[in-house]
Amino acid sequence: MEGSKKYYKYIDIIRLLACISVLLYHLNILKGGFLAVCTFFVLSGYLSCVSAFKEEKFSFVKYYINRILKLYFPMALVTFISLTIISLFPNIFWLNLKPETTSVLLGYNNFWQLNANMDYFARQASSPFIHFWYLAILLQFDLIFPFIFVILRKLGDKFHKAIPCIITFILVLISTFYFYKTSLDSNVMFTYYNTFSRLFSLFFGVMLGFIHNYYGSIIPKILKNSVINKIIFYFYLLALIVLFVYTDFNS
């Protein structure tokens, strides 16, 4: 239990760093803060996988209900509150926001913003839902994750535990290549908003989840040492901070 608390403490520290980085980015203080989104995606993929393994028998219904309560319901609530506040301003009409609001509630806002030529990095962006592209990708991932998890787990349990890890690693490589290719051939926003170019982060998290559950028990004892753990963890944090400080969206 103590190890589990320490484990989640490390994850909470990473989350806190990512949240602060995003905030500082939007305050024009940290130019690479937008990279924290990748960190959130990795954590989402990882935690989804680890949580699914905790269920003796994975339930699709239970998973979807959980995601509706934790992700979709709060998002929908914020959306309707935003629309209520917007309605108080006479120069802003609901009908102008209807297509965008629909895309938010149906989970395809990232593609809507892409089609509408929205620029996330434009400081004058006026949409109240400019940041909801991230939630759209999470919703799309949550829609397919149960199927991916069940298939990969069956392959791992029936044949070899390495198979899910290898498959997710291949998917990470494919998505990374797609990310790189589209960044060269397309507008940067096509790469930024596109679900397929973001899958590398999510599948990397899923891969780590399978590695954790299948191979966590055979990690050498020296790596489980609390001092070694802290050194690795804080080295990772330092690497993140360097990326957040020195990376800009054109790189």
PLM features per residue range, with description:
Residues 9-12:
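Short, Arg/Lys-rich segments that mark the N-terminal edge of DNA/RNA- and chromatin-recognition modules
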Residues 7, 17-251:
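Hydrophobic membrane-embedded alpha-helices
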Residues 1-7:
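Short, Lys/Arg-rich, polar N-terminal cytosolic tail immediately upstream
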